[in-house]
UniProtKB/Swiss-Prot annotation:
It comes from Lactobacillus johnsonii (strain CNCM I-12250 / La1 / NCC 533). The lineage of its organism: Bacteria, Bacillati, Bacillota, Bacilli, Lactobacillales. NCBIfam families: PRK04885.1 (NF003424). One of its GO terms (molecular function) is NAD binding. One of its GO terms (cellular component) is cytoplasm. It is found in: Cytoplasm. This is NAD kinase. It comes from the Bacteria.
Length: 270
């Protein structure tokens, strides 16, 4: 087995990385950042997302394991004090596997060029200096005309991130669905929207066609990364044929993660 390590530069993280490297070397597990079988991220959910984008070209061949140096994350199963147990499991135990859907974006520019992107959490479109005006289509059928700050399309795992702060629903990651949420929509007689998050089935897709003009300048974000372009003809969003896979050696129920992250019930109520 070959592993790659992806980590942030925090002091507590670097200490965990140093200890983890010693454990892996002692167990004769090769650290290979070029062609790994497993990518271990040390940090938080943001670090895991960075690891996904670093190795997305290998996403069909590799699995991910997340070590959290803070509280338990949505993508990270292990805490920093559990790395001995994690390495033991790597060498002795057959893991179960969990796969989560990814979001595919196809951006078509005004010149007809196409750019394909993948996102683990979400993608947004905004206008740089003015209000975004765009027509929204579902399965290539017109749905609504939007005016506002922007639109966000998220995966089920991304539903606990930016989408939730926009009023979106929290969706279990076993559901292959996409969710679109509005960012500060403006409704009038010309631009009328549902003014509610929508969730679409895995065989459906969303197309956003921004209003075109000489002074257009749009920013498309995907998991915090940016694609800037002056003229965007349309963006298609759909569930990707690719998935991200995680090695699971210990199970934490999704709703327990949600409760721990957002509610934090006193233990005497459990």
């Amino acid at each position: 087995m070959k592993v790659a390590l992806v980590y942030n530069d925090k002091v507590e993280t670097l200490a965990v990385v140093k200890a983890l490297e010693k454990l892996l070397n002692a167990r004769k597990i090769e650290i290979d950042p070029e062609n790994p079988d497993v990518v271990i991220t040390i940090g938080g959910d943001g670090t895991l997302i960075s690891g996904f984008h670093k190795y997305q070209n290998l996403v069909d061949k590799i699995r991910f394991i997340g070590v959290h140096t803070g509280h338990l994350g949505f993508y990270t199963d292990w805490r920093n004090f559990e790395i001995n147990k994690m390495v033991d499991n790597l060498t002795k135990k057959q893991p179960s596997s969990a796969s989560y859907p990814l979001l595919e974006l196809i951006i078509t520019t005004g010149a007809g060029e196409k750019k394909k992107l993948l996102a683990l959490n979400e993608a947004t479109i905004k206008r740089v200096s003015k209000t975004l005006k765009a027509d929204v289509y579902i399965r290539d059928q017109f749905f609504e005309s939007f005016k506002g700050d922007g639109l966000c399309v998220s995966t089920p795992t991304g539903s606990t991130a930016y989408s939730k702060s926009l009023g979106g629903a929290v969706i279990h990651p076993r559901l292959k669905a996409l969710q679109m949420t509005e960012i500060a929509s403006i409704n009038n007689r010309v631009f009328r929207t549902l003014s509610s998050p929508i969730v679409i089935a895995p065989d459906e897709w969303i197309t956003i066609k921004p209003e075109t003009g000489s002074d257009d300048h749009y920013v498309v974000t995907f998991d915090g990364y940016e694609f800037n372009h002056k003229h965007i003809k349309k963006i298609e969003y759909r569930i990707s044929q690719h998935v991200i896979r995680f090695d699971k050696y210990q199970h934490t129920h999704f709703w327990n993660r949600v409760e721990d992250a957002f509610i934090g019930q006193p233990k005497d109520k459990q």
